[in-house]
Amino acid sequence: MTDADTLSKLTRINGRYGMFHRLTAEADTGDADFLFSAKDNLVSKDFETTAGSRILEGYHPVFDATPIARMRGAGGMLIGKTNMDEFGFGTFSANSAFEVPKNPFDTDRSCGGSSGGSACAAAVIDDHVSLGVSTGGSICCPASFCGVYGIAPTYGRVSRYGLVDYGNSLDKVGLLAADPAKLGRYMRVIAGRDERDPTSCAQPDFEMTNCRIEAVAVPDEAVENVSADVSRAFESALESLQSMGVEIERVSMPELKYAMPAYYVLAASEASTNLARYVGMRYGKQDGDLTQGFDEYFTSIRSRYFGEEVKRRVLLGTYTRMAGFRDRYYAKALQVRMLIIDAYRKQFRTHDAVLTPTMPFVSPRFEDISEMSPIETYKADCLTVPPNLAGAPHLSCPCGYDENCMPIGMQFVTDHWREDLLLNMAEDWGKSFDVRRPEVLI
């Protein structure tokens, strides 16, 4: 299925786009039925796993994350681990400690993040599927920027065993592909209970149905602050959906504006506890001065090998969990999360899905990203954070292009455990929308 020539092509396109942190050295897939890649925060026994961080450089796991194991069990061959924002902290994959993946439609622009390498691989490698991970938008954002389909399932639908955690109550393993049919095909593979991940054990069985999205709610708040290009593409997509028989209703969901601050409190709080394990002893870098005391040694390792965004979020999360601040911030953020969930549930009583643009703008240039403040970067996630905070399944589909041929996506959100509606929509939309592909080299 692949040979030395194919491996050479993979190496060459990786030099152009930088989507892989590590590529397979095997020139023959043997009996593999399909090829796939995985975000570098899913551990794999034959690839270094770094989660985009120097502090994990040199970490070689002895087991596969459950989603990778299930893909391999279905006949797949893992061809590489994809570049990402360090520990998933970012919107543009520009916070990688290694190589920053480049957008396949314009290499001066971002792939999105934090699963940017996975989206790029899905876009430029023909007949490919990639495992991604979403915490606050890390599947749908890069799917939108790279013009592919991306699905983040219900929280708990796919096992997180073997995932380098960002936020335990937020992380979801999903899929990215240029062919929407692959999302349904491989969601059947990776979904399901796993005794090693208790959060996956309460789910109903994953079943595909013939049910379709027939009515969608479009929140006014979600289209107020998007760019003109995104607005035009989204409105055109609404017209196309109506021609497919989908009923469109404009609604108000004022609760959505509270999702961002609540998300960053919860995500940073959980991240700061998860990252406490990286101290230069059990995983990755272990080159500190062993004559130092524990505090000095840990501080030295973390200061040298954590990136600036990681340090920022650790400090933020530690602050929100401090005595005297926990009730003021963390507990209140949990209450806001329930408000967001209730707001979605209200819409799902009369609609099959909530529909918004995926991102408020097209992929920015790296030179513009470097000028953004942290707050401006965080605000870019305003449309992808709400469904992630609610733990609801969501799908990004390509829906248009700007004057520079940069992709624009739209995001469907359905009720918990209703991935079937999203997967059917992806296939239906794929038959009616003329998707443009970048130069496919493999």
Please identify what each model-predicted range represents.
Residues 19, 196-202, 245-254, 345, ...:
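Flexible, glycine/charged-enriched surface loops at secondary-structure junctions
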Residues 98, 262-268, 407-417:
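Short basic, glycine-rich beta-strand/loop surfaces that mediate nucleic-acid
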Residues 39, 190, 248, 277, ...:
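Glycine-rich, small-residue loops and helix-cap segments
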Residues 1-60, 64-65, 87-90, 199-202, ...:
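Short, well-ordered alpha-helical
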Residues 152-237, 296, 300, 435-441:
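A short helix-breaking turn/cap at a secondary-structure junction
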Residues 72-188, 390-399, 406-409:
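Short glycine/serine-rich loop segments
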Residues 6, 39, 183, 216, ...:
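Residue-level signal for inorganic ion chemistry
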Residues 55-59, 171-178, 317-322, 412-413:
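Short, well-ordered beta-strand elements within core beta-sheets of diverse protein domains
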